[in-house]
A protein has these predicted regions:
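Long, terminal "pre-/pro-" and other extracytoplasmic accessory regions
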Residues: 1-174
Length: 174
């Protein structure tokens, strides 16, 4: 028994938001693209001290491409959230009777994005809004209603680019 401690890179006082997603997933199983998972620094600590440490996919920070970006207002971000939560979950309603999100934490931080079809080793850190909380779904199976609640503290249910409002898929990394 012990603890897992995750560390996040901070740039000018703003952290890269840690989520449960590792990034670098494939769009489909037939994809031949090379992928790139997120940077991860993790310590496992038990009663005797540090048991182990992993540092994966370290970033090399280059030059700042654009300074003093204009971010979307929070009200603009919330309008995008309200619309895109419906859009991104539309296909789930084929299998579920209902799905309810309880967002209890909204975080402004950085996320790394990249274009695996162009360059799987170079990305940029962009400001994003992440929406965390819980999700409860109900579905029917053999005539009985089943309810399932997911509450993972670092699972982002939606990531919105804070500059242009586009949606970032945390699993894919873009």
């Amino acid at each position: 028994n012990g603890y897992r401690i995750d560390y996040a890179r901070t740039i000018n006082g703003v952290p890269v938001t840690q989520t449960i997603a590792n990034g670098g997933a494939l769009e489909d199983m037939d994809s031949t693209m090379e992928t790139w998972s997120y940077e991860s620094l993790c310590f496992y600590v038990d009663k005797d001290g540090i048991e182990s440490m992993t540092y994966s996919n370290p970033y090399t920070i280059g030059k700042i491409k654009t300074e003093n970006l204009n971010l979307l207002s929070f009200s603009e971000v919330m309008k995008i959230y309200e619309k895109m939560m419906v859009v991104t979950n539309a296909d789930n309603m084929q299998y579920e009777n209902s799905r309810v999100y309880n967002i209890d934490r909204i975080v402004l931080g950085y996320a790394r994005i990249y274009e695996p079809s162009t360059d799987a080793h170079t990305g940029i850190l962009i400001p994003v809004w992440d929406f965390f909380g819980s999700m409860t779904s109900e579905s029917e199976y053999n005539g009985e209603t089943e309810s399932n609640t997911i509450k993972t503290p670092n699972e982002s249910f939606l990531t919105i680019n804070a500059v242009d409002g586009s949606i970032i898929d945390r699993n894919l990394g873009y």
